[in-house]
């Protein structure tokens, strides 16, 4: 029976085309998305956010994938070409990059539904029975095959993945739905200020994860109807879902119930949530297991030397405690505690780095103390700098301090030039 079930799901995934919406600005991340789209943002020591929905597709058996790009997409496209360009079309697999090309109108993508509509011919050429539309800006582990199976078994025309979240978290941030006892959706609001609570829990609501399954022809028809509606905002949550739930079978797919202990989803749309999700990775056994060989997270693998820790004097020791340190890093006579260092980070002597997310190609000079910080790519932290200990002083220096006291530092804030950095400087480990 298990073999039959696996074969059944594999047939469904082969008949599916996945479209990942990766054009979001991520404006709540402020300066972290000044030069990059949110899906291109770094996460977990070596990955980009876009790697997670792409890896979910591959691990679920979906190998026909389109990635819709728009906002500041250069670094995202470069990453996709370098890390995801190995698929072979002749074997029925591909990752296609779909920037706004204005083939159907003079406008850029005007909303999530319009982004799909403007690529309808590309989808049609693939002849899929089902189309999955996926969010490209969340960190999550999800077996799409199970969602496809539930979609087919329920007789749905559309299925929306959902999860229970606190009301205050959903307000103004997520689409919120109500369902009957069979999880058929009978109400939907996009980012309401006052979400409808669950009947059995007045403190929580059922929020959309932004992942959808459609029967292909039904999707095409709804996109055509929406394109002719001059009052539409061209958005699935604002327009299409509310317009179809009364007359068509649209079902919710409860993410937590199907994922079991392996279910993991994080919205990293703010500085605080981005920092918190990265900090989860330094736990001894994090909920998102990046070391699970049965569900690997794929990414571009830059060729780098191993991480190195040097000096063991009484007043300086290169060490990392409860931390993640990536290739190309040198921790020279400083202590790294409960932190993540992405590739090519150099930390010089006599420093203390705690609860920090250090993005690639950063250099931290001698005698620095950093705590609860995010250091953006390419920053050079001057000798003797202290950040995260006096938040008012940090604000006065031009750093961004989040609601929960996380300090974001970028090259612009340090008065350092932006652009032209392709690799970390060649720094002597004796410093």
Curated annotation (Swiss-Prot):
Protein name in UniProt: Glucose-1-phosphate adenylyltransferase
One Pfam family linked to the record: Hexapep_GlmU
CDD domains xrefs: ADP_Glucose_PP, LbH_G1P_AT_C
PANTHER family documented for this protein: GLUCOSE-1-PHOSPHATE ADENYLYLTRANSFERASE, GLUCOSE-1-PHOSPHATE ADENYLYLTRANSFERASE-RELATED
Species: Alteromonas mediterranea (strain DSM 17117 / CIP 110805 / LMG 28347 / Deep ecotype)
Sequence similarity: Belongs to the bacterial/plant glucose-1-phosphate adenylyltransferase family.
Protein's job: Involved in the biosynthesis of ADP-glucose, a building block required for the elongation reactions to produce glycogen. Catalyzes the reaction between ATP and alpha-D-glucose 1-phosphate (G1P) to produce pyrophosphate and ADP-Glc.
EC identifiers of the protein: 2.7.7.27
């Amino acid at each position: 029976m298990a073999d039959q079930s696996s074969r059944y799901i594999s047939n469904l995934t082969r008949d599916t085309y996945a479209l990942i919406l990766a054009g979001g600005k991520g404006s709540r991340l402020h300066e972290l998305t000044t030069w990059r789209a949110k899906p291109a943002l770094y996460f977990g020591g070596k990955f980009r956010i876009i790697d997670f929905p792409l890896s979910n597709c591959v691990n679920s058996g979906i190998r026909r994938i389109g990635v819709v790009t728009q906002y500041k997409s250069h670094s995202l496209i470069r990453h996709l070409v370098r890390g995801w360009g190995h698929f072979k079309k002749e074997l029925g697999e591909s990752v296609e990059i779909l920037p706004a090309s204005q083939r159907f109108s003079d406008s850029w993508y005007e909303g999530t539904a319009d982004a799909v509509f403007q690529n309808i011919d590309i989808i049609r050429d693939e002849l899929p029975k089902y189309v999955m539309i996926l969010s490209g800006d969340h960190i999550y582990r999800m077996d799409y095959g199970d969602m496809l199976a539930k979609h087919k078994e329920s007789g749905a025309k559309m299925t929306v993945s959902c999860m229970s979240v606190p009301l205050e978290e959903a307000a103004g941030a997520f689409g919120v739905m109500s369902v009957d006892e069979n999880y058929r959706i009978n109400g939907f609001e996009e980012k309401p200020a006052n979400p409808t609570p669950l009947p059995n829990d007045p403190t929580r609501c059922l929020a959309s994860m932004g992942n959808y399954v459609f029967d292909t022809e039904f999707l095409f028809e709804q996109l055509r109807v929406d394109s002719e509606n001059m009052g539409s905002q061209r958005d699935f949550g604002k327009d299409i879902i509310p317009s179809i739930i009364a007359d068509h079978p649209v079902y919710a797919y409860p993410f937590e119930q199907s994922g079991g202990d392996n279910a993991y989803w994080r919205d990293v749309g703010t500085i605080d949530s981005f920092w918190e999700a990265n900090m989860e990775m330094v736990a001894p056994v994090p909920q998102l297991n990046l070391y699970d060989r049965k569900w690997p997270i794929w990414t571009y693998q830059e060729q780098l030397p191993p991480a190195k820790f040097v000096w063991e004097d009484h007043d300086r020791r290169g060490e990392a405690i409860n931390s993640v340190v990536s290739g190309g890093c040198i921790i020279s006579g400083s202590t790294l505690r409960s932190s993540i260092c992405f590739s090519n980070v150099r930390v010089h002597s006599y420093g203390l780095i705690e609860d920090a997310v250090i993005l690639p190609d950063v250099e931290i000079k001698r005698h620095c103390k950093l705590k609860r910080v995010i250091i953006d790519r390419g920053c050079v932290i001057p000798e003797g700098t202290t950040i995260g200990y006096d938040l008012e002083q940090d604000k006065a220096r031009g750093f961004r301090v989040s609601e929960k006291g996380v300090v974001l530092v970028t090259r612009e804030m340090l008065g350092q030039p932006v652009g032209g950095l392709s690799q970390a400087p060649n720094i002597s480990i004796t410093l």
